[in-house]
Swiss-Prot record:
Stretches that traverse the bilayer: none
Chain positions with Phosphothreonine modification: 318
Pfam family, one: SET
UniProt record similarity statement: Belongs to the class V-like SAM-binding methyltransferase superfamily.
A GO-annotated cellular component: chromatin
Name of the protein in its database record: Histone-lysine N-methyltransferase set5
Keyword Phosphoprotein part of the UniProt annotation: yes
Keywords on record: Chromosome, Cytoplasm, Methyltransferase, Nucleus, Phosphoprotein, S-adenosyl-L-methionine, Transferase
Location of this chain's protein in the cell: Nucleus; Chromosome; Cytoplasm
Physiological role: Histone methyltransferase that monomethylates 'Lys-5', 'Lys-8' and 'Lys-12' of histone H4 (H4K5me1, H4K8me1 and H4K12me1, respectively), thereby controlling gene expression and remodeling chromatin structures. Monomethylation of 'Lys-5' of histone H4 (H4K5me1) is required for subsequent acetylation and formation of N6-acetyl-N6-methyllysine (H4K5acme).
Gene expressing this chain: set5
GO biological process: chromatin remodeling; methylation
Catalytic activity line of the entry: L-lysyl-[histone] + S-adenosyl-L-methionine = N(6)-methyl-L-lysyl-[histone] + S-adenosyl-L-homocysteine + H(+)
Protein source organism: Schizosaccharomyces pombe (strain 972 / ATCC 24843) (Fission yeast)
């Protein structure tokens, strides 16, 4: 079996990018495109990489050395390719994936790669429909940064300037709006944990807005899961177990779509759909709805769930 070509994708040369992965057919959102076991896993130690590679087949060694090396002079022939191509396994280790390394970067990626410890593999899921002939693209960096910040990180760490659909926009106003949205997402990253404790109603509004502006930036998958699980935990902490159950259900649906039902996260959260009170954070918490009075203006079920109407995109009129 050729791992570089299946019924749904193939790895081919991409102009100005080296190799890349192209969809051969339309890939619906939620499709697991592939799962891959790491060739090497390490804490970025050159000697460890060299020793691990020596145990691999000649074909695997050659495939490793064909990978792009953004740091040949400073990191050498082993650490350089690893640093330039590895995907995160956990907080301490990265993994070298020969197939995964062929996915190029985009600042609004169409796939989400996730380490699945139960499978001991990285899984790659489509976060939106991918058309036949479209490149399959992941992200190498934290995308909640401005255009200038992203370009600096990509050039310094990965040796290239990004010309994706987000970065190639020339109109000043559109780029400024994108930067403002991503700056707001970064703010939510820093403040949401505290907000969920001290201002739960405001936090629910912010979580809904967080998902909305992420989608405006064509960022799907990761933040959907994070925001829904934050909303679930918020409701548990404050005793709104009816809402907690709904958010647990929404969260498991998002995890199923973007990571798979074999995800540890899915198995962990799904049990709270029927019994949110069994969560450790619910111990000793009295049942108390977050919104004691019905708001006549929130007749829509989603508005009622989040306790607010969906905010307009406040950045679209930015000068």
């Amino acid at each position: 079996m050729n791992p570089y070509e299946t019924e749904i994708y193939k790895v081919v040369p991409i102009p100005n990018k080296g190799m890349g992965m192209i969809a051969k057919v339309k890939i619906p959102v939620g499709t697991r495109i592939f799962a891959e076991t790491p060739l090497i896993r390490t804490k970025s130690d050159a000697k460890e990489i060299e020793e691990a590679l020596s145990t691999k087949t000649k074909e695997e060694q050659e495939a490793f050395h064909r990978l792009f090396n953004a740091h040949p002079d400073t990191m050498g022939p082993f650490l350089g390719p690893f640093y330039s191509n590895a995907l995160t396994i956990d907080e301490t280790k990265g993994g070298m994936f020969l197939l995964g390394s062929r996915m190029n970067h985009d600042c609004s990626p169409n796939v989400k790669h996730t380490w699945n410890p139960r499978l001991d593999q990285v899984t790659v899921h489509a976060v939106r429909d991918i058309e036949a002939g479209e490149e399959i693209l992941t992200t190498y960096i934290d995308l909640h940064k401005s255009h200038t910040e992203r370009q600096k990180i990509l050039l310094e760490h990965f040796g290239f300037k990004c010309y994706c659909s987000v970065c190639s926009v020339e109109e000043r106003k559109i780029r400024k709006i994108s930067d403002l949205r991503r700056k707001q997402l970064a703010y939510y990253d820093r403040t949401m944990a505290k907000m969920c404790i001290v201002n739960p109603r405001g936090a629910l509004r912010a979580l809904r807005h967080r998902i909305h502006i992420a989608h405006e930036e064509l960022l799907f998958g990761r933040l959907d899961i994070i925001a829904l699980l934050d909303a679930f935990r918020l409701c548990v902490i404050h005793g709104d177990f009816e809402r907690a159950s709904i958010f647990a259900k929404k969260g498991t649906k998002a995890i199923s779509l973007y990571e798979g039902t074999d995800s540890e996260k899915y198995l962990k959260i799904s049990k709270y759909v029927e019994n949110p009170r069994s969560h450790a954070l619910a111990e000793g918490v009295p049942a108390l709805p977050l919104f004691l009075e019905e708001d006549d203006e929130l007749s829509d079920l989603e508005d009622n769930l989040w306790g607010c109407k969906l905010e307009e995109d406040v950045y679209s009129d930015t000068d």
